């Protein structure tokens, strides 16, 4: 099969994956009701088990989309294809109630190859955020003046959507040491939320009255630009330190958001707002230490400047319906990751070529919930990469993750997830074969 045919097959596979991933949301978190949804981990097969570290990772056999400067180090003879999926079991608890949920989702599709010496290209598809929830609350609000029966309200919340990113990037090594790179991404997705509220006199089996509904909807389309740099420092024969940093440019999302309210009197009130969403500026930095091509230890820190970003909120009353573009609903998010990878002998027997990985991460909330800070996130991960054959550079990646999402604010839900991440990294020496042909 020629290189062109293989590239055509890859493009077809990626388009199929894009369609599959865009149809799935993989979430049951009630916290995805706020902001742009729950923010996704965009790490891939090799670094997902390492906590998501990426800034100082530069490897010729891996596609590190979180720092595009790393593309400059891709092996000159290889075409790398990386794809992964996740299985998630969640346990959500709060105020005496417990709910379990199961989800499966395609997590990423990436590829990379070298264009010429010191110049590499990366392309791929990853989810940016996820909206997915369906829950209800029942509250006693008083008693009827005529029957003295209790009046309760049942509110059902439903949401679906999230943002997806299709990106292409290049990494360049202009001179010995320094590498620079950039990703430009096209982002799109749905922002769909609904609220249905019913009042009951004497219980849900009785006739309801004064029902009202709200439906939020927006079809979001925008861009994302990430700029990165890396610099390796050879400490001695056996030790290499690589430092790296990236910056993501924040900007308005110009699409319109619509709020439709259906009142108990049968009226429909519609309100719209433009430029109601915004992406934050993000600054990330980190470093990795590699010892004898066997042990890698890395750590990253990211600051996401969400504070002051725009988000729509409702100003609906009994007779009016309007949207306010608020700038006080977000918090700056701090994200810390650390991880390690060990391989006994990259050129040894099969068992010696298995990668063992560990990682942890911590993130503060980016949204406020009823004026209080949202949940913090804690994660512990472990995994392996198994060679497909004795001498192959292609691997099967597998890792498990425990994610704990909780807030110090009373009354908020605590979420615990056990996740299994499975992926494959194909590393074929296409261009070497072409040379012999």
Identify the residue ranges that each predicted region occupies.
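PAS-family sensory domains
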Residues: 12-15, 352
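Bacterial N-terminal signal peptides that target proteins for export
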Residues: 1-11
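Acidic/proline-rich low-complexity IDRs
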Residues: 6, 14-15, 294
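N-terminal signal peptide c-region/cleavage motif recognized by signal peptidases
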Residues: 17-19
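A periodicity- and composition-biased signal for non-globular, repetitive helical segments
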Residues: 11-12, 39
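Subset of outer-membrane beta-barrel
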Residues: 23-437
């Amino acid at each position: 099969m020629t290189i062109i045919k293989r590239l055509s097959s890859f493009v077809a596979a990626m388009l199929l994956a894009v369609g599959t991933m865009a149809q799935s949301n993989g979430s049951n978190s009630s916290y995805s009701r706020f902001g742009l949804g729950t923010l996704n981990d965009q790490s891939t097969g090799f670094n997902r088990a390492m906590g998501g570290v990426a800034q100082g990772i530069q490897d010729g056999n891996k596609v590190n989309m979180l720092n595009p400067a790393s593309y400059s180090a891709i092996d000159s003879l290889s075409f790398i294809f990386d794809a992964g999926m996740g299985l998630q079991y969640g346990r959500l608890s709060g105020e005496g109630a417990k709910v379990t949920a199961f989800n499966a989702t395609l997590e990423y599709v990436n590829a990379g190859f070298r264009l010429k010496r010191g110049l590499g290209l990366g392309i791929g598809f990853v989810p940016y955020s996820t909206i997915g929830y369906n829950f209800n609350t029942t509250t006693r609000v008083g008693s009827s003046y005529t029957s003295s029966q209790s009046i309760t309200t049942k509110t059902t919340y439903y949401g679906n959507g999230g943002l997806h990113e299709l990106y292409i990037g290049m990494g360049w090594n202009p001179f010995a040491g320094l590498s620079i790179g950039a990703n430009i991404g096209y982002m799109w997705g749905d922002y769909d939320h609904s609220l249905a509220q019913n009042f009951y006199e004497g219980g849900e089996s009785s006739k309801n009255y004064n029902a009202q509904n709200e439906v939020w909807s927006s079809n979001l389309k925008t861009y994302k630009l990430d700029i990165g740099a890396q610099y390796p420092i050879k400490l001695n024969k056996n030790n290499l330190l690589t430092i790296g940093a990236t910056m993501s440019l924040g900007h308005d999302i110009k699409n319109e958001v619509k709020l439709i309210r259906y009142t108990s009197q049968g009226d429909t009130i519609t309100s719209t707002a433009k430029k109601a969403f915004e992406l934050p500026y993000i600054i990330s930095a980190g470093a990795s230490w590699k010892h004898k091509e066997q042990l890698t230890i890395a750590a990253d820190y990211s600051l996401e400047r969400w504070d002051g970003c725009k988000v729509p909120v409702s100003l609906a009353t009994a007779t009016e319906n309007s949207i306010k573009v608020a700038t006080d609903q977000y918090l700056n998010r701090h994200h810390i990751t650390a991880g390690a990878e060990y391989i006994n002998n990259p050129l040894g027997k099969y068992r010696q070529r298995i990668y063992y990985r560990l990682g942890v991460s911590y993130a503060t909330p980016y949204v406020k919930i009823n004026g209080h800070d949202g949940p913090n996130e804690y994660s512990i991960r472990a995994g392996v990469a198994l060679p497909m054959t004795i001498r192959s550079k292609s691997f099967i990646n597998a890792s498990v993750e425990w994610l704990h999402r909780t807030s110090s604010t009373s009354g908020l839900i605590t979420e615990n997830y056990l996740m299994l991440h499975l992926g494959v990294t194909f590393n074929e020496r296409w261009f070497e074969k072409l040379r012999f042909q």
